[in-house]
């Protein structure tokens, strides 16, 4: 779990997301509260439940990007799901319990990686011994068994030194490696993914752990042997329990597009993919026990962050019980021209940096001037105002159109310097931006 302070979390998010300080502060506080709760004594810790968040804002302002970046910072089980993928229990489609199953799978994978990393040093030693056994087979006794020698031979020590220095990396050896389990692919009908995954694991376990000889270069064999030895050092049952604990205490679920499951007007018949999904989400958010293939998971202390554009529906269109379980409301603001300018220049891997790097592979040096950046931002904002407002995503559309000619002719422009200033942008975009009908289809 991340031990970063709220200020550090916001600072890290600022490297990738422009503006939306309120949303950043809310998720930073929520993430820090996970750590604070774990410092309490056990009795009080059980009573402190997470304050779930509802992020409201137009499309393309950074809701999903905040979730993506938060996943990397959290160092905790994290899953992002689309609310529109689910239907009410009993109907064709995914049921909401699969959110917790997927979160548990993600936790098992995360904990396994951490456990393997923790045992890597010991695994490297064991892998080294196995390679040395192939290079210098140990002496055998009268019964054909390898003798345990008290001290490694001088030749073995010499080869160990060469192996560590990388002198033997390109030498080819034949070594026994664990064979891949029998592959059985079962296509799951909607809603039955859990049953099919259990069937798959059953078929994979039928073959047992077989080994087969493979010819590999030593550097490639070393990587595979380290992974194999590290996996042997991990206790699967302990790993599952650690993963379930991580989900229950630190798990975070991000539900995107929650506004799309709001009830719209008076409809007749069951509303299985809207209000039905909201009703099914209630026990998950409130706290219940979900059965997974790794064990039973309690959802009482899992943090839920929901987000939606709410352009057609309103937050009040959610059923009252679900509104009550999302107590913290954060409104994200629509982006302005100055925000667009900052998006083009400030993030670590901004769109302009990406284009410059892509063109540099062809030997073309692209330079964006301040006036060019300003004109691109104005063009994107203008198209958003006159057509549909899709936020920062409009910058991708505008830049792709602007760079189209350079991208197409890049191989013929090797060694050239191209400056993209206000004049260049106006020449390539003004006609499209001014013609509302054209910009509707092209930008």
UniProtKB/Swiss-Prot annotation:
GO terms for molecular function: ATP binding; ATP hydrolysis activity; peptidase activity; proteasome-activating activity. InterPro entries: AAA+_ATPase, ATP-dep_Clp_protease_ClpX, ATPase_AAA_core, Clp_ATPase_C, HslU, P-loop_NTPase. It holds the Pfam family AAA_2. One of its GO terms (cellular component) is HslUV protease complex. ATP binds at residues 18, 60-65, 256, 321, 393. The keyword Metal-binding does not apply. GO terms for biological process: protein unfolding; proteolysis involved in protein catabolic process. Induction: By heat shock. It comes from the Bacteria. Disulfide bonds: none annotated. The keyword ATP-binding applies. Keywords: ATP-binding, Chaperone, Cytoplasm, Nucleotide-binding, Stress response. Its main location: cytoplasm. It is found in: Cytoplasm. A double ring-shaped homohexamer of HslV is capped on each side by a ring-shaped HslU homohexamer. The assembly of the HslU/HslV complex is dependent on binding of ATP. ATPase subunit of a proteasome-like degradation complex; this subunit has chaperone activity. The binding of ATP and its subsequent hydrolysis by HslU are essential for unfolding of protein substrates subsequently hydrolyzed by HslV. HslU recognizes the N-terminal part of its protein substrates and unfolds these before they are guided to HslV for hydrolysis. Belongs to the ClpX chaperone family. HslU subfamily. This is ATP-dependent protease ATPase subunit HslU. It comes from Salmonella typhimurium (strain LT2 / SGSC1412 / ATCC 700720).
């Amino acid at each position: 779990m991340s031990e970063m302070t709220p200020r550090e979390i916001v600072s890290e998010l600022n490297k990738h997301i422009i503006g939306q300080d309120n949303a950043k502060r809310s998720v930073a506080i929520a993430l820090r509260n996970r750590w604070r709760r774990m410092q309490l004594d056990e009795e009080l810790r059980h009573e402190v439940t997470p304050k779930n968040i509802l992020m409201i804002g137009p499309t393309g302002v950074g809701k999903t990007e905040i979730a993506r970046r938060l996943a990397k910072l959290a160092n905790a089980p994290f899953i992002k799901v689309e609310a529109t993928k689910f239907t009410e229990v009993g109907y064709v489609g995914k049921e909401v319990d699969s959110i917790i199953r997927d979160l548990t799978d993600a936790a098992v994978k995360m904990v396994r990686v951490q456990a393997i990393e923790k045992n890597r040093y010991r695994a490297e030693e064991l892998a080294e011994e196995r390679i040395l056994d192939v290079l210098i087979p140990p002496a055998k006794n009268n019964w054909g068994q390898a003798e345990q020698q008290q001290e490694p031979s001088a030749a073995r020590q010499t080869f160990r030194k060469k192996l560590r220095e990388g002198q033997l990396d390109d030498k080819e050896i034949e070594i026994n490696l664990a064979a891949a389990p029998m592959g059985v692919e079962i296509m799951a009908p909607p809603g039955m993914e859990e049953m099919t995954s259990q069937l798959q694991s059953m078929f994979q376990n039928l073959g047992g752990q077989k080994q087969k000889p493979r010819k590999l270069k030593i550097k490639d064999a070393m990587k595979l042997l380290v992974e194999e030895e590290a996996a042997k050092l991990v206790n699967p049952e302990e790993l599952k329990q650690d993963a379930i604990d991580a989900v229950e205490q630190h798990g975070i679920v991000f539900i995107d597009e929650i506004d799309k499951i709001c009830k719209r007007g008076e409809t007749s018949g069951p509303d299985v993919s809207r209000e039905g999904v909201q009703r099914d989400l209630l026990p998950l958010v409130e706290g219940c026990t979900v059965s997974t293939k790794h064990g039973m998971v309690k959802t009482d202390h899992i943090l839920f962050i929901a987000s939606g554009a709410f352009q057609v529906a309103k937050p009040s269109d959610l059923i009252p019980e679900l509104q009550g379980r999302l107590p913290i409301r954060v409104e994200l603001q629509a982006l302005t021209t100055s925000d667009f300018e900052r998006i083009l220049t400030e993030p670590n891997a901004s769109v302009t940096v990406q284009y410059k790097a892509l063109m540099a592979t062809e030997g073309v040096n692209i330079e964006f001037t301040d006036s060019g950046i300003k004109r691109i931002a104005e063009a994107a904002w203008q198209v958003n105002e006159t057509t549909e407002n899709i936020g920062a995503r409009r910058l991708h559309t505008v830049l792709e159109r602007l760079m189209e000619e350079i991208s197409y002719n890049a191989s013929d422009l090797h060694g050239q310097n191209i400056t993209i200033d206000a004049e260049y942008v106006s020449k390539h975009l003004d006609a499209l931006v001014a013609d509302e009908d054209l910009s509707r289809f092209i930008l």
